[in-house]
């Protein structure tokens, strides 16, 4: 049992060290935004979000407005569900559908480890705004970032993850209680897998 705990701890540390350079990339350099007809307007995002989140979406307009003011209009978004749990080290698993205007829709799965001062569990509906996605296959990447949110029962949380100039902004509304700050990454795959690394 101890050997397994050591192996999992070593794997999480390796994953965090691998994700750190991606997290340090920050916002993508300015380089012409995608054509406006391939991006989603704030109204389109709100309509999709209200349909998806339902009655808990009162704060959605404010959180989408904040994301749009920081990163502009996305050229894709993901609607899905996920579950996560942590006590110092954590895991997150999810699945959803990536929507784009000009590259089609795509079923995606995500997994990821995290480590930090973090405890709790949650089940969440997730809307991820996707920026600078050159094609749907480019989503299959590890996106690193720092998560420092408090998830309250029925509340919203927003973070940012980045890899290869693609920015993901997960917006979560869920059931559970999770408090803390952690560093980790999300890995996107075309098929479901239990391997978070």
Feature locations, PLM:
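Sec/Tat signal peptide C-region and signal peptidase I cleavage site
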Residues: 20-24
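Bacterial N-terminal signal peptides
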Residues: 8-19
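Bacterial N-terminal signal peptides that target proteins for export
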Residues: 1-9
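Small-residue-enriched, tightly packed secondary-structure blocks
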Residues: 25-197
């Amino acid at each position: 049992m101890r050997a397994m705990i050591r192996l999992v701890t070593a794997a999480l540390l390796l994953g965090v060290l691998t994700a750190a350079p991606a997290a340090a990339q920050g916002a993508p350099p300015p380089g012409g935004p995608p054509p406006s007809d391939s991006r989603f307007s704030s109204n389109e995002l709100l309509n999709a979000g209200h349909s998806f989140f339902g009655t808990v979406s009162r704060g959605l307009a404010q959180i989408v407005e904040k994301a749009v003011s920081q990163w502009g209009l996305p050229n894709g978004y993901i609607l899905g569900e996920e579950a996560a749990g942590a006590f110092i080290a954590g895991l997150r698993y999810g699945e959803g559908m990536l929507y784009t205007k000009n590259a089609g829709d795509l079923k995606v799965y995500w997994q990821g480890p995290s480590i930090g001062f973090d405890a709790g569990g949650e089940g969440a509906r997730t809307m991820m705004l996707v920026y600078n996605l050159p094609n749907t296959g480019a989503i299959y990447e590890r996106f690193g970032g720092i998560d420092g949110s408090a998830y309250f029962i029925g509340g919203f949380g927003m973070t940012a993850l980045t890899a290869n100039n693609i920015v993901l902004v997960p917006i979560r509304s869920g059931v559970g209680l999770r408090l803390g700050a952690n560093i980790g990454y999300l890995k996107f795959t075309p098929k479901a897998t239990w391997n978070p690394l």
